[in-house]
Amino acid sequence: MADVRDVMVEGESGLIACSARYGLEAHYIVSKRRVEFQNGARAYLYSADEPNRLRGPQHEKAWCDELSTWRYADDAWANLDMGLRLGDNPQVVGTMTPRITKLVRDLVKRAGEGHDVVLTRGKTSDNKANLPDAFIRSIESRYAGTRLGRQELDGELLEDIEGALWSLSQIDDCRLAALQDAVSLQR
């Protein structure tokens, strides 16, 4: 929950700071794990480290930050997904540095198939107006042109590792969905 509080609620680009920029008051109520806005809206706070807390509550909107680093991504996402049942058009915004995980791969696939996912990509340079020039110069000089730079600076979803014998798509093509007619071997 510390990341949720420190980044998404109280951070420089968190809910409280962004609300203030638009003339709205937002109050973080620690004991209730929520942010209340002056217009009556409420944002309930959850951590993917506690996926069962998402079991049961229902929501209209969700913001999932650093989705590709969630330890219990499948459980947290499934519980959140089942609770998105309020309003006419429940929606999720996922923000992250792209990393290959099963969940991210599934979301990218759904976006490519024209399902209910819209994929938006951005680069660090798109956010230059909000970052110190010294920071931009420093990270670009160190990471531009590297694999880490492609991921962190360019927002690329890197599936394959240079020099690997097989690509992830080749491995995925050979995966078994489930063992059928498994036989128990006894001695």
Each predicted region: which residue ranges?
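Conserved SF1/SF2 helicase motif Ia
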Residues: 1-4, 89
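A generic local structural motif
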Residues: 47-51, 79-80, 173-178
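Inter-Walker segment of RecA-like/P-loop motor cores
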Residues: 3-60, 157
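Short, surface-exposed connector motifs at secondary-structure boundaries
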Residues: 58-63, 89-91
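ATPase catalytic-site recognition across NTP-hydrolyzing enzymes
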Residues: 128-187
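ASCE P-loop NTPase helicase motor core
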Residues: 69-145
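Short, conserved catalytic or adaptor-binding loops enriched in Gly and charged residues
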Residues: 34-38, 108-115, 174-180
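Walker B catalytic acidic pair
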Residues: 65-67
